[in-house]
């Protein structure tokens, strides 16, 4: 029997601590409360909602997960699966798939939903593209997703490093399809530089997540801009009409059905081909609280709505994540593996 939907809960948002935080040390991770305490917003007195029956993750048995983790550590590589505490990590790792996170483990942003560490990043590792390409070849991957932390400290936002990774993978694994999940390249001239650089070696799928509806950006994505993200997606598509574009949105942060539908319309109006829709899960008690658990029936309704808008592929469900079954999503959108 389907459980009734949890009611929306009130959210009290207060300004962050006005006292000057301690200076960031290069390469030192600020996680959990240390990270969120640096955010311009804090969340207080939010009741904890019990997870419904459809929010469950099966933990596979066997050594595949540990073997893949060992391979990643051996090559000094990082996955967003681990750094962002993705609930699907065991399923993906047990099938030998992973979403690689380049440009370090420290992000310059402080998004309230994200479990990736904040701080002052180290310079990019020049050996990372070769290590990544060797690992992809060793694993025999036919489809790989490469993402990164935000690098507001770099003039190109890390675009050249993305291109170096794409080129290295293609040199050693020419039949592997590559999806990149990029930051927003926000900043004066940064989007222009990033798009110019990415044109040198574009991916097979370009993914940038819108994350949430525009009204929630101040609380969820401080430092980001809704229209900027839409423009990035549209400009890439205009430059590369034959390359699939993709975005993702989380539910459960306080949005309404009407707001989600409006965001889907905005994405299609900006020439986005593929969309993922999934339930937000709070990574620690310090992060943005879960305001509501959307039901499987609502996810199905959004899938139908997205298909009617003309997306080439809609992945909508409680446990859907941007990179979850990315190869199947791409195949569904006509990207050959």
From Swiss-Prot:
The UniProt entry, under Gene3D superfamilies, shows: Aldolase class I
Q: Which GO terms describe its cellular component?
A: cytoplasm
Residue span(s) of domain Radical SAM core: 93-312
* Pathway the protein acts in: Protein modification; protein lipoylation via endogenous pathway; protein N(6)-(lipoyl)lysine from octanoyl-[acyl-carrier-protein]: step 2/2
Tell me the cofactors it needs. [4Fe-4S] cluster
Binding positions ([4Fe-4S] cluster 2): 107, 111, 114
Subcellular location(s): the record lists:
Cytoplasm
- Write out the catalysed reaction: [[Fe-S] cluster scaffold protein carrying a second [4Fe-4S](2+) cluster] + N(6)-octanoyl-L-lysyl-[protein] + 2 oxidized [2Fe-2S]-[ferredoxin] + 2 S-adenosyl-L-methionine + 4 H(+) = [[Fe-S] cluster scaffold protein] + N(6)-[(R)-dihydrolipoyl]-L-lysyl-[protein] + 4 Fe(3+) + 2 hydrogen sulfide + 2 5'-deoxyadenosine + 2 L-methionine + 2 reduced [2Fe-2S]-[ferredoxin]
- This protein's UniProt keywords: 4Fe-4S, Cytoplasm, Iron, Iron-sulfur, Metal-binding, S-adenosyl-L-methionine, Transferase
Q: Give the cofactor note text.
A: Binds 2 [4Fe-4S] clusters per subunit. One cluster is coordinated with 3 cysteines and an exchangeable S-adenosyl-L-methionine.
Cited InterPro entries: Aldolase_TIM, Elp3/MiaA/NifB-like_rSAM, LIAS_N, Lipoyl_synth, rSAM
Keyword Cytoplasm recorded = yes
Cross-referenced SMART domains: Elp3
MF GO annotations:
4 iron, 4 sulfur cluster binding; lipoate synthase activity; metal ion binding
Keyword Metal-binding applies: yes
Pfam families named in the record? LIAS_N, Radical_SAM
Q: What CDD domains does the annotation carry?
A: Radical_SAM (cd01335)
Q: Which residues bind [4Fe-4S] cluster 1?
A: 81, 86, 92, 323
What EC number(s) does this enzyme carry? 2.8.1.8
Mind telling me which HAMAP family this protein's record contains?
Lipoyl_synth
Q: Which family does it belong to?
A: Belongs to the radical SAM superfamily. Lipoyl synthase family.
- This chain's protein is named Lipoyl synthase
Taxonomy of origin reads: Bacteria, Pseudomonadati, Pseudomonadota, Gammaproteobacteria, Lysobacterales
């Amino acid at each position: 029997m389907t459980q009734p939907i949890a009611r929306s809960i009130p959210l009290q948002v207060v300004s962050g601590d006005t006292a000057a935080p301690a200076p960031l040390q290069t390469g030192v991770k600020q996680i959990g409360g240390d990270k969120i305490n640096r955010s311009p917003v804090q969340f207080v007195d939010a009741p904890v909602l019990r997870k419904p029956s459809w929010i469950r993750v099966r933990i596979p048995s066997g050594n595949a997960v540990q073997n893949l983790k060992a391979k990643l550590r051996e090559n000094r590589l990082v996955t967003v699966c681990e750094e962002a505490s993705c609930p699907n990590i065991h399923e993906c790792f047990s099938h030998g798939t992973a979403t690689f996170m380049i440009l370090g483990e420290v992000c310059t942003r402080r998004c309230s939903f994200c479990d990736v560490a904040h701080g002052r990043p180290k310079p990019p590792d020049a050996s990372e593209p070769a290590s990544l390409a060797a690992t992809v070849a060793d694993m025999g991957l036919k489809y790989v997703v490469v993402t990164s932390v935000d690098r507001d400290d770099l003039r190109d936002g890390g675009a050249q490093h993305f291109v170096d990774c794409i080129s290295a993978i293609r040199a050693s694994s020419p039949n592997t399809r590559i999806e990149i999940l990029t930051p927003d390249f926000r900043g004066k001239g940064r989007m222009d530089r990033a798009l110019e650089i990415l044109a040198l070696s574009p991916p097979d799928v370009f993914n940038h997540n819108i994350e949430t509806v525009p009204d929630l950006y101040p609380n969820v994505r401080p430092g980001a801009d809704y229209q900027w993200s839409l423009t990035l997606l549209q400009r890439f598509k205009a430059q590369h009409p034959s390359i699939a574009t993709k975005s993702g949105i989380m539910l459960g942060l306080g949005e309404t059905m009407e707001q989600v539908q409006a965001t889907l319309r905005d994405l299609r109006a900006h020439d986005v081909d593929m969309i993922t829709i999934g339930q937000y899960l709070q990574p620690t008690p310090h992060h943005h609280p879960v305001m509501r658990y959307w039901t499987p029936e609502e996810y199905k309704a959004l899938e139908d709505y997205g298909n009617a808008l003309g997306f080439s592929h809609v992945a909508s469900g409680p446990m859907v994540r941007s990179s979850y079954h990315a190869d199947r999503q791409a195949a569904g959108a006509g990207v050959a593996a």
